[in-house]
Every structure is written in structure tokens, then in C-alpha cells.
Amino acid sequence: MGMRPTARMPKLTRRSRVLILIALGVIALLLAGPRLIDAYVDWLWFGELGYLSVFTTVLVTRFLVFLVAGVLVGGIVFAGLALAYRTRPVFVPNNDNDPVARYRTVVLARLRLFGIGIPAAIGLLAGIVAQSYWVRIQLFLHGGDFGITDPQFGKDLGFYAFELPFYRLLLSYLFVAIFLAFVANVVSHYLFGGIRLTGRSGALSRSARIQLVSLVGVLVLLKTVAYWLNRYELLSHTRGGKPFTGAGYTDINAVLPAKLILMAIAVICAAAVFSAIVLRDLRIPAIGLVLLLLSSLIVGAAWPMIVEQISVKPNAAQKESEYISRSITATRQAYGLTSNVVTYRNYTGDGEATAQQVAADRATTSNIRLLDPTIVSPAFTQFQQGKNFYYFPDQLSIDRYFDRNNNLRDYVVAARELNPDRLIDNQRDWINRHTVYTHGNGFIASPANTVRGIANDPNQNGGYPEFLVNVVGANGTVVSDGPAPLDQPRIYYGPVISNTPADYAIVGKTGADREYDYETSADTKNYTYTGSGGVSVGSWISRTVFAAKFAERNFLFSNVIGSNSKILFNRDPAQRVEAVAPWLTTDSAVYPAIVNKRMVWILDGYTTLDNYPYSQLTSLSSATADSNEVAFNRLLPDKQVSYIRNSVKATVDAYDGTVTLYQQDEQDPVLKAWMQVFPGTVKPKGDISPELAAHLRYPEDLFKVQRMLLAKYHVNDPVTFFSTSDFWDVPLDPNPTASSYQPPYYIVAKNIAKNDNSASYQLISAMNRFKRDYLAAYISASSDPATYGKITVLTIPGQVNGPKLANNAITTDPAVSQDLGVIGRDNQNRIRWGNLLTLPVGQGGLLYVEPVYASPGASDAASSYPRLIRVAMMYNDKIGYGPTVRDALNGLFGPGAGDAATGIQPTEGGAPANVPPNNAPSPEALPGTPPSPPTAVPPAPEASVTLSPARAAAMKEIQSAIGAARDAQKKGDFAAYGAALQRLDDAITKFNNTQ
């Protein structure tokens, strides 16, 4: 029976078609409208920032990739459909029970819809997925050579970095396209009678056989190419159980030959498949495909497994030795740990040191860091917040400046930003939120090696940081008492101000000044932004676009927006850098600095690869996790890398948002490729000014990745490497409140890189022995401009206490625990241990330093402001302890050891300099007493003041309690010492409560 006439499908009425078109238009508008608005806003934003070429390059690249991939995949699928339809049988046997007939009728009635719509939809999806690989394609087009060849095939590493990923992507798309074309061809031939299934048998038309066999043959040929590319990918893969990344003995001697054999078999199978075009016998291609499958199981899987079990495992250390050496060399190259960067020196770690030797280490002992940036933020807030809407981040930053005596010092630094979440009541309405409270004010720095005075001193501010402030003062001029002069302390861009949704500010002259700036004793002074940053919202078109962008009608109706108005948005420094350099991975830390009298945010950018031959594959998230990152939820994305370079230093101006990218690594081939993709966006390294270079620091995340790798890859001998016997461990943070690895610390200390006593700014970390708590090494990375990036590793041979053992020894020392027990008695104060620093001192010795803080109450309440109360130290199992660095050093090494320390002395009389602002109440004085009791608590009244009998009696009791405390201390009687302290507390309370 011939094919029956095609039944006509019912037609839609004109009204129905119009309604459908309207509905489709609305859906398209809802889907595409926000994206079009976002694209237009991005175009404005990139243009204002001076990086419009980045926006257009990415957009054009993605569009072209989308177009090419969509046309390629959709075109191949369309060809499969079209060929099947055009070569369909003229007559198709049919009967009333044929289940295909109804589908055939539907397809024929909507032939264009199915014939064009299906390939178009597949092409659309393929294009959408493909455009996300624009990075891979740009690197293929612009990548160059590394100048290093792989040890197996002798190919330049640029092939693996830039070419191989593209070839793999192209092969994957061709494979998917041919497979989908095969499926489409099979379905079409089945619908139109080219394939007929009757009972247990079937029939193929000549056209169906030729087309399907050809497509299968092409798939087999693509598999042949895949086997060829798989050979190169062996060099960056990890076989289960190997202690290194890359091809091992089994891979080179079994898997690699197997790939070549399978490739040859695949070529033979492809020929067998294509033979069916002429021979008309499908058994031959079927046999070929079965042969390919069996070969892949036997040759590709079983044979390597046999070699692994019989030949390799019994002699693994010797068999893998050559390939471990390859991995050691490649990993050091890929992570910047080669001999021209890393210097190893033997260091005893337990050398004896005299007081004179310790005092001679002036660069170290005068810069011992007492302020822990993860603890002192509440003190910054208490003393320097000023207004409820100003705020400091929970973790502050460390930077260095030269003090007035031209000595290099490290400082805890912070920008006093505006935090929109802390606005209250009518401060939160749209006009105030976005046009009045627009910016922060001030750069705050505290010398990290000192505090205001001893916490138990008569003044109420002992133990708190000394604050050096650059801020807009009460008369509108800039008060520049900070560590460096600053012309503009207003902050419009920063991580805190952008930490809320819709972080935009509308600025510009539209009449009277609107932006809150500062207050005098009489009134509030406002300000108008004059910077170059911001996108104009003066026109009605712009106002409409941003009203849609932020879903805010006030853009259209508010009279505070005028022709000169601009909008500042995307104000997070890291996000701004990531937007203009989408190829960078940014460091989790961003810190403020004063450079050329401007406040800028500085952050580090990395270029990475994940297929560097033989280099260890590393998870950035795992490698950079430490107790700080976990506590503040700042973990990097879980990205796998086998190559990393700190290729870019970026700055973001805190006032106008200007983003500047500087080339840091002039040899990085990946950066060179991106500089060709986006010419002019990255400035050469020579453009880094000396003022900026003085504030660049070795990046923390890179250092953490490198120290984790140095734990293994410091080993030179491959047999020792295989045994893991000489591996190291990153120590856990010994602080009882921590839950991860000990973070590295920025310090100023004697120059490890130059091995002299000059002061150097460096990033340091201790390393433990493998699965033990004894020290194995001490790592220091220099941040000084002259030796920037040089890593020095002091290897420690003996059993020297690691951070955990040192912390245990300090916290369980009887004198320490007794004293802190008195201070924290009855939950009056919460004791907090600061960062445990490991410092080389003397001739081969290591000094552990741990500051001790206390805050009122038993918990971290909002009103609890930690202050430094003690300094604890350990050196060669001996403990030093006191209210100051000088006291602890003298107690540990003898008189004179602390002569070079930056001392803090009890302040005579009242409050010290830099008293807290008027609106900040002074915290309560700590009830505890240092080992050397204060000379007067509270301050003695002036001679002209006559005390009442009750106060005179209280003062007499105070003096008596102090004397008793001194006597108890000399005798070592801690019970009497505690009782004397309680008497002192009671006497002070009585003195304060009487008239």
C-alpha cells in the first residue's frame, strides 16, 4: 500500500496567532529585557572606567563563539535531517496499525518547524554552552611559547597551556554534533520509511545505510583523534594511588603504547565501517566496532592494570623514581619554587642566646607584633568609629610604613568606611541612604608593636592601640596625623560599603551640598563629590535605565537627581578588578594603603592553569584555608590549578574608583597572552612607582599554596619523596578557638633573605614535621622591593617545639595560668590569645611570642573591647611573661635583653594621647595586676586637693594592698598575691564610690 495523503492540521485563527505573538513577545521581553539593560549598564560602567575595550572584546568574542558553535552543531544536525528527508522512499508500505503514521503526519504538517526548529534549538544550546569557553579560545589565538619543553614528548609547554585545551574542546563539539546528527538521521529515516522494522527483522534503504554508516565512521575517526590527544593529557593526570601528578611508569610503558595501538585499531575499524557503503554488509562494521570495544577493555584497561600490579607495585619506589623527579622539577617550575627563588639554609632552631645577642637583634625585638588584626577590630570601632554608620571590617590589615625616625614599622591599618547596614530609622530612606550617606571618612593606622600603656595603669586606656589618623577634621581641612600624608580621606569605594545589595550612591552638584561629611560643635557639614568616577544619570534615558536596573522608581521622580548627577556603583575593589580583568583569580585579601597622598586599595591577581605537565594539581580552596579564612568565611573558590603566578598587582582608588593593573611577573606566558587579548589594559612593571612598590606585599594566598607544596616538594631524592618520610606539615592553629591551619603572618623583623640584621617586611610561617608537632622548617617570603618574592627556608634538624607544643607550654605555665586565672576570675574578663609568632633570634634560636588580650565579660559581646594585658614568650622550653615585651624578654634572657624593644610605660596621671572620641565611653579598667604592680591605682590627686576622711582611708588601703601584692610576688605566694589583688580591687571601688 502506498503512502496515504497527508492529513491537514487545523489552522489557527488570525486572532489566535496575534495573541500567541503578543505572548511570545512579552516572554521574550521578560527574558531578554533585564539582560539587555544589564549589558547597557555594563557598557556605561566599563566606558566610565576606561576599560570599554574589555567589555567589547569579551562581548564580541562570546558572540562569535556562540555563532560559530551554533551554526556548526546546528548545521551538522540539520544536514542529518535534510539528507534523511531528501532521500526518503517515495512509497512507504503502511497499514492502519502503523504507530509511526501519526507522527509522520504531524512532522509533514509542520515540516519547517521540525526541520529547522530542532537544529536551531540544538545550535542555540550548543552556542550558549560554547560561549562560556571564550577564555580557552582567546588563549589559543594569542598564546605563545613557555621556552620549556615537556620531558616525554619534547613539546613546548605552550602547546599544553594554549593549544591542547582548544583541540579537546573542538573535538568534543564535533563528537556531540556528529552523534546528534546520527540520532536525527536514524529518527528521520525511521519516520519516512528508510528504516523498517517488521517483527524480528528490518530493512534499510540504500540512502539510510550510506548516511548512517558514514556518520558512524566519522565518529570512529574522531575517536582516533581522541586517542592521539589522550597521549598528551597523560602528563597532567593522576592515576589512583600515585603520590605525584603526571604520567608514571605504567602510563609511559603501558597506557601510552595502548593509546597508539587503540588508535591504529580505530583506523582499521573506521575503514571497516566505511566498507559497508560499498559491500552492503553491516556485519563488517559491527565486527569492527566490537573489536574496538574489546580492544579498549583489554589493551586500554586490563593490560595497564596487569603491568601496575605485577611490575610496578612490588618495586614502586624504583620504578616511579624517574617520573617523580619529573614531577618535582615541574611542580617547582609551575609554582615559582625554583632554586633562583627559594633558598634553603640550615638552622639549629635551639641555639642558646644571651641578653646581649637578643638585644642586638634590634630589627626583630623592636618590631615584635603585639596587635592581632583579627582581634583588635572592636577597639578600632570603639575609639575611632565616630558615628553609628561608620565601620571597620572584622579582620583588619597589616602594612608597613617608615616612622618619624625613618625606622621601618608594621601597622594595623583600616579604612573607616560607611556601612549601609548600620544606618538606622530615617537614615534608611532612599534619599538619605543613596544621596546623603555616601562615603566613609578616614584612614586609621596603629603601630603593631606597641599599645597606649599597660592595661592596669591608672589611665583607662592602657592596652589599647595607639591611633594615627588621617581624616577630614572639624573645620573641613584634612587632619593628616597618620603614617603618611593623605590629601583625600573620603572613601567612596571599599569592601564594607559594597557589602549590601544596591550599593550605589548618587552624587554630583544639584544645588546645596547633600552628602554627610563631618560635624562641628554647632552643625553638620555636607559635601559634594568631585571625583572623576561615576556614570551620568542626568538624562531621562539614563534615569529610566537605572530605574529598571535597580527596580527603583525614585530615579524617575526624585528631584535630588539633576543634570550633573552621577551614580557610583559596583564599589567593591575586588569585584572591580575581576570585572576589568576577568581572566584573573584575585587574592582573598584586599588592604588599604596611602600611596602618593592618595588612599588606594591594593590586591593581588593570579594567572592559573590546570594542565601543566607533571605539576601537582592543587585545590585553591583547600590550600589557602586557614583559621582566619574559615572564621571570616573568605575561602577561595574550589578551583583546581597546577600553575600559578602572581602576575598582576592592582590598585583601586578609594575616592574615584580608578582601577589600575600593573604587570608584576614579566616572564609569565599566560599574562603575555592576555596582554595581547586586551592590549593597553595592563601597565608594564616599570610604571609601578617607588611609593607603590613600598606597599606591595607578598600575596598571602600564593604563599599558602607554596608552603603546602614545599611540605612535599622540598625533597630532592625521588625515593625519599615516595616514602614520604621527609615530608612536612602545615601546623594547625594552636589557638583553642581555631579550627584550621595556622595562618602565615606579616611581620617586620631582621632580614632573612639577606641574612643580616636590617629590618625587613616579610610573610612567615612555621612548618612541622610530617604528622608530628616538632618544627621542621621556617619559611619567610620577602616583601621588600629589593628582594621581593625571594623565599628563604630555614631547615631545622632537631626536635624543636612546634607552635602547638609552644602554646601548650605557655598556657600551662604555673605563673601564666595563675595570673590569668586572677584576671579572669568570676567571668569578669574573657581571656583571648593572639597570634603566635615564630621569630628567629640570636644565633640559631627561635622565639615564640603570643600576646594576651582580655575583654570585659565572659563572651564576645558587642560592648566588649579586647585590650592587650600580657605578652608571653617561649625560648628553648623557658617561658617569659610580663605586661610588656621588654619585661618578657628581660625575664626570659636576663636584664638588657629587652633594651631594643618598643617599650610601653605606665602613663603618669590621666589619659594618654589620642583619647577616645567624646561619644565613645572608656571601657572599665581590668581588675588584674601585672607581675610588677602599678605604683598608683587610681592616680594620686593633686596636692591642692583635700581628700575627705573616707577617701583618705580608701587611698591608704590602696597603698597597703599594693605593698602586699609586691611582697607576695617576691615570695612567689600566688594565693597571697590573689588576695592582695582582691583587696586592691575593693579599695579602688571604695575610693571611686566615696566623696
Curated annotation (Swiss-Prot):
**Any one Gene Ontology cellular component term annotated for this protein:** extracellular region
Question: Region annotation Disordered: residue ranges?
Answer: 900-947
| Membrane topology classification | Multi-pass membrane protein
Q: Where does the sequence pass through the membrane?
A: 18-38, 63-83, 113-133, 175-195, 210-230, 259-279, 287-307
Q: Name one Pfam family in it.
A: UPF0182
Q: Where is the composition biased (Pro residues)?
A: 928-941
Where is the protein localized?
A: Cell membrane
Cite the InterPro entries for this sequence.
UPF0182
Could you confirm whether the keyword Cell membrane appears in this record? Answer: yes
Q: Which keywords does this chain's UniProt record carry?
A: Cell membrane, Membrane, Transmembrane, Transmembrane helix
Concerning its family, UniProt says: Belongs to the UPF0182 family.
Please give the HAMAP family that the UniProt record associates with this protein.
UPF0182
Give the protein's recorded name. UPF0182 protein MUL_2505
The species is: Mycobacterium ulcerans (strain Agy99)
